[in-house]
Amino acid sequence: MQYILVVEDDYDLNQAICYSLKKSGYGVYGVTFMEKGKQTFIENQIDLILLDVNLPDGEGFSFCQWVKKQREVPVIYLTARDMAVSY
């Protein structure tokens, strides 16, 4: 089974994404804070991260940079921002 980490601070959106992914057969960890995302990433084998850019305890971009220093994992940003930024 492949495991997806959803880091999204909007609780309802987080739950909806997790529900949809679980129904599609994925293992899912849903968190609403960056620090909890780091802890979950360290403690579990994560195959993909769906990551919000704006989080209550930091920016998703810094979380992504931290992840890339740990190991190579695909990251898809979830955001309503209107500017493209490459990291």
Short names for language-model regions:
Residues 1-87:
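N-terminal/domain-start alpha-helical segments
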